[in-house]
Amino acid sequence: MGQTITTPLSLTLDHWSEVRARAHNQGVEVRKKKWITLCEAEWVMMNVGWPREGTFSLDNISQVEKKIFAPGPYGHPDQVPYITTWRSLATDPPSWVRPFLPPPKPPTSLPQPLSPQPSAPLTSSLYPVLPKSDPPKPPVLPPDPSSPLIDLLTEEPPPYPGGHGPPPSGPRTPTASPIASRLRERRENPAEESQALPLREGPNNRPQYWPFSASDLYNWKSHNPPFSQDPVALTNLIESILVTHQPTWDDCQQLLQALLTGEERQRVLLEARKQVPGEDGRPTQLPNVIDETFPLTRPNWDFATPAGREHLRLYRQLLLAGLRGAARRPTNLAQVKQVVQGKEETPA
């Protein structure tokens, strides 16, 4: 009897309930049919080395992410929840994924060159070996307050002709997660999508805050149609930002301020507050519950605590629901009244 070969794709399908739960914890939803289509067809046709049977290799996942997060019309915002869930399974694997992880790469450190050992000096019992005396050091004089000395730590260096030296190294940045590293690398290249990352785990699993920059907001606004023209496209963009960046409450307001008009923001917030769940899971009409779950003024949510992160996760989900609700625009009756039946046209 033949044996069924287990692949990363078939493994995720066998544990689909856990995959969906993992995606839900990140604030997104994934569907099995699209999960299979992306893995077996669309990501394979990107020609970046993605195998049809799937993989938990971070190198392959990063190559697919570059295509998905490409700016403007070249990206695929609708695929963000799926590749983000793949990465989550690879970076924080459950027990059933660990046997299928690729082996870690060996360190690429170069071997230290062998330096010849100095030969021992010839000694003799007739002549004692005298220790070598260090050359005399010049005396350290206290600075003369009247002398025009330059403080090299505070003065700017003089201009040099033709920069041929190595570029100056920038300040060291705190350690961030693989997604944060990927997004920050793209920020160095202005031709690619902006890479702000408001909230990610740093050293000791403590969240660190990276605010949006003006260039991030400008690129998102200039490379995408307005909400009134194509609400679905802009909603997909904002969804990808909410998933990958995990913004705080203030960041969400800044994002809405940059991408939506005042009237559009009011519609989105109104639709989102209609979806606030009550104790039974259905939308509630209790003002205190609505204000606590989806506040219009800055809440006292600490993203460094589990409770604060849970508040932010639910807030981002409701904000996305508000965007989808506001995208369903009502019929403009004024435009309907402008339609006049022609003389040769039938009422049908």
UniProtKB/Swiss-Prot annotation:
GO terms for biological process: viral budding via host ESCRT complex. Keywords: Capsid protein, Host cell membrane, Host membrane, Host-virus interaction, Lipoprotein, Membrane, Myristate, RNA-binding, Viral budding, Viral budding via the host ESCRT complexes, Viral matrix protein, Viral release from host cell, Virion. A motif (PPXY motif) lies at residues 157-160. Residues 97-208 are annotated as: Disordered. A lipid is attached at residue 2 (N-myristoyl glycine). Residues 100-119, 136-146, 156-171 have a biased composition (Pro residues). The record marks 127-128, 197-198 as: Cleavage. One of its GO terms (molecular function) is RNA binding. Residues 120-132 have a biased composition (Low complexity). GO terms for cellular component: host cell plasma membrane; membrane; viral capsid. A motif (PTAP/PSAP motif) lies at residues 118-121. Coiled coil: none annotated. Transmembrane segments: none annotated. This protein is synthesized as a Gag-Fes polyprotein. PANTHER family: GAG_P30 DOMAIN-CONTAINING PROTEIN. This is Gag polyprotein.
